[in-house]
């Protein structure tokens, strides 16, 4: 959808995003994919122009834009062949903190997320035995005085290695002791980077498409009790999941990775065949 047909004021946002994307051509993204690299320069450029803080209220240093404006940002990024994954991740994870975090959590973290001094781009949900069945997750957070002790494993967690903070979904009440399936699961906002080497281990996962995927291990990790965001999974998780789906749709609507292949199918096909052939040649030559 072209949102600027509905609200012409959004054309300025499109133009601004387009200018940022112009400095990051296809070669930049091919290098990122080939090396499984995080697009550091691109993310920094978006942050400098305020796009990663689009939905953070002005009172916390953000732009205070609505979901439609954020959708335009993501769509335009992909329209120009860039990858908006880091941008959309920060938008929806930040939303959980904004809507459900304590005043202390919002005051402590949102201004730093808005100015780029902290990144919140990781959400620890999926586990080896609970892909689509989130309620079956096994990572536990057990209360111990003014701390929780976290034990478990997350997998396919994008950008954990590049994120300062993580939203973590963990079981705080055993599944056999709750009345409703959705009870007993809590969301925490943890200082992930400070916990590396203190019970947290992050390992990269090499995949066909570069999303900076990782698996994250929690080995009796102590986190402060005030990192708890909330315990009502339905209120905490479902609204943000809906926003995430909207963001994914916006990216698909863009003419980047999806639309670019339709606009230039012959060129896209030739590049794909060429890269495949080169890869096969290199593998055979090394034998």
Give names to the regions the model predicted.
Residues 151-199:
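A short core secondary-structure module
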Residues 85-104, 131:
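N-terminal glycine-rich flavin-associated loop
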Residues 252, 261, 272, 276-277, ...:
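Short linear motifs in low-complexity or flexible loops
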Residues 116-125, 169:
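A short, Trp-centered hydrophobic/proline-enriched beta-strand micro-motif
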Residues 220-235:
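Long, acidic (Asp/Glu-rich), low-complexity accessory segments flanking structured domains
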Residues 1-87, 104, 108, 112, ...:
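Amphipathic, small/basic residue-rich leader segments at the start of a protein or domain
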Residues 136, 194-222:
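Flexible, small-/acidic-enriched active-site or ligand-binding loops
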């Amino acid at each position: 959808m072209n949102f600027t047909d509905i609200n012409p004021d959004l054309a300025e946002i499109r133009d601004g995003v387009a200018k940022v994307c112009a400095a990051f051509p296809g070669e930049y993204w091919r290098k990122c994919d080939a090396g499984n690299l995080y697009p550091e320069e691109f993310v920094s450029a978006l942050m400098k122009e305020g796009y990663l803080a689009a939905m953070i209220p002005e009172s916390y240093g953000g732009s205070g834009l609505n979901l439609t404006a954020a959708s335009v940002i993501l769509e335009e990024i992909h329209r120009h062949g860039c990858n908006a994954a880091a941008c959309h991740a920060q938008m929806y994870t930040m939303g959980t903190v904004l809507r459900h975090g304590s005043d202390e959590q919002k005051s402590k973290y949102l201004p730093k997320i808005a100015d780029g001094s902290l990144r919140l781009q990781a959400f620890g949900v999926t586990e080896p035995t609970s892909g689509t069945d989130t309620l079956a997750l096994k990572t536990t957070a057990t209360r111990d005085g003014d701390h929780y002790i976290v034990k478990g494993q997350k997998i396919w967690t994008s950008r954990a290695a590049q994120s300062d903070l993580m939203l973590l979904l963990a079981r705080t009440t055993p599944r056999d002791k709750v009345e409703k399936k959705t009870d007993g699961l809590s969301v925490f906002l943890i200082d992930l980077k400070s916990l590396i080497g203190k019970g947290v281990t992050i390992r990269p996962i090499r995949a066909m498409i570069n999303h900076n995927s990782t698996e994250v291990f929690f080995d009796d990790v102590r986190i402060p009790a005030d990192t708890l965001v909330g315990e009502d999974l339905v209120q905490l998780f479902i609204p943000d999941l809906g926003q995430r789906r909207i963001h994914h749709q916006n990216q698909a609507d863009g003419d980047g990775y999806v639309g670019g292949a339709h606009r230039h199918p012959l060129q896209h096909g030739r590049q794909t065949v060429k890269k495949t052939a080169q890869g096969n040649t290199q593998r055979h030559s090394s034998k």
